[in-house]
Amino acid sequence: MQPRVVILDYGSGNLRSAQRAVARVGAHATISSDPHTALEADGLVVPGVGAFAACMRGLRALRGDRVIGKRLAGGRPVLGICVGMQILFERGVENDVVTEGCAEWPGTVERLDAPVIPHMGWNTVDAPAESAMFAGIDKDTRFYFVHSYGVRTWEMQTTSPHLKPPLVTWSTHGTPFVAAVENGPLWATQFHPEKSGDAGAQLLANWVATL
């Protein structure tokens, strides 16, 4: 049976392209803004484009932040894409305005420190060797990015021997920034896997395989 995946419609993101990309790798993908439907799906994709603050307003308007929290509390997979990854952090800072995020991870989304903004186009990533997200993907593969803001410092410290620390993948545009995170049922990418060709399809297939 195909796993059921909901692409969360909260007024932001490349909904149709994400839906098509997830469907192509074997899931039954639908677009929905209904919190109950999003909560009950086998997998939830949280897309996002544009401003951090606008995305958080849209997400909170349909209680999407609570849906994400409830899913993760129950170990149910969530995949954040682009600003859908950024809003998983504690806060975003745009034009000196601070907006609270979902706070699944500590850290601040801020403007990239680079001579050319936005970061638009193809770039390589440095993924941990044990990454399940990047399984079957060559190390020098490029993914498609389009963003002006990102997480430049990973602040989460895990010292307990009983807790598995998140796997953090980095990329560089001017200075390093977080390109992807794997944290149990919560995966997220700053780049767009749905626009990243065969490599993006492999990544999405790896995620669907966890459902």
Curated annotation (Swiss-Prot):
Subcellular location: Cytoplasm
Molecular function terms, GO-annotated: glutaminase activity; imidazoleglycerol-phosphate synthase activity; lyase activity
Record-annotated Glutamine amidotransferase type-1 domain positions: 4-211
Entry annotated with the keyword Hydrolase: yes
GO CC annotation terms, alphabetical: cytoplasm
EC number: 4.3.2.10, 3.5.1.2
SUPFAM superfamilies, per the entry: Class I glutamine amidotransferase-like
NCBIfam families, per the entry: IMP_synth_hisH (TIGR01855)
Subunit structure, interactors included: Heterodimer of HisH and HisF.
UniProt name for this protein: Imidazole glycerol phosphate synthase subunit HisH
Gene that specifies this protein: hisH
